[in-house]
């Protein structure tokens, strides 16, 4: 059974365990694994305003995804940056795609108009995923990070998810969104995965 739900504080160590494997690759530009305390602080900071989701398979967390503000200044409030990390054993099974669909549907309720994703150029799997989801390349940051003895380019993907009204409604915090609407979106997307036997999907 697959379950997609909002994050809880008690998930922090399981999520950090997944993230730590990526810290040792160019996929994450963080060079040292953060402490449990620091990681929990990040979860709390992000999840108070934006969707932060986890995916469980038979009760075990196998991935997580969240949205966060794209930039700090007020005029950027209608954009959000998306991040997804999946346990390597579950890559390529549709979980990342399902996370994105759930996040985007929630972000629409929050009046987000554009979503972004920053992807290390060498991460070809993520490149293919974003293109298949209708993201386009907004630009490339050349040699923007140095890690593991190499300079790395970063691709900025973008996707429009709302109308650019002349006078847009302000961004709504996740706290302003009805909990049942979020639960329903998570359930709709987890049902898609439950109709596929991901344990036997290549």
Language-model regions, residue ranges each:
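Helix-loop element at the rim of GNAT/NAT acetyltransferase active sites that forms part
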Residues: 17-33
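Acetyl-CoA-dependent GNAT
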Residues: 31-89, 100, 160-162, 200-201
């Amino acid at each position: 059974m697959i379950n997609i739900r909002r994050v809880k504080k008690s998930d922090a160590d399981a999520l950090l365990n997944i993230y730590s494997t990526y810290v040792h690759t160019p996929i994450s530009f963080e060079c040292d694994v953060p402490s449990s305390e620091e990681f929990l602080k990040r979860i709390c900071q992000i999840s108070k305003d934006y969707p932060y989701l986890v995916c469980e398979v038979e009760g075990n967390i196998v991935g997580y995804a969240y949205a966060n503000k794209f930039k700090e200044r007020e005029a950027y409030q209608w954009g959000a940056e998306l991040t997804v990390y999946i346990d390597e054993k579950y890559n390529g099974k549709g979980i990342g795609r399902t996370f994105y669909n759930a996040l985007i549907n929630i972000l629409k309720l929050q009046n987000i108009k554009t979503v972004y994703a920053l992807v290390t150029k060498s991460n070809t799997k993520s490149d293919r995923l974003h293109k298949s989801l209708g993201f386009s390349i907004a630009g490339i940051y050349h040699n923007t990070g140095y890690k593991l003895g190499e300079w790395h380019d970063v691709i900025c993907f973008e996707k429009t998810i709302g109308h650019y009204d002349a006078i847009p409604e302000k961004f709504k915090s996740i706290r302003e969104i009805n909990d049942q609407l979020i639960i329903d979106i998570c359930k709709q997307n987890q049902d898609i995965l439950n109709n596929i036997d991901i344990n036997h999907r290549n």
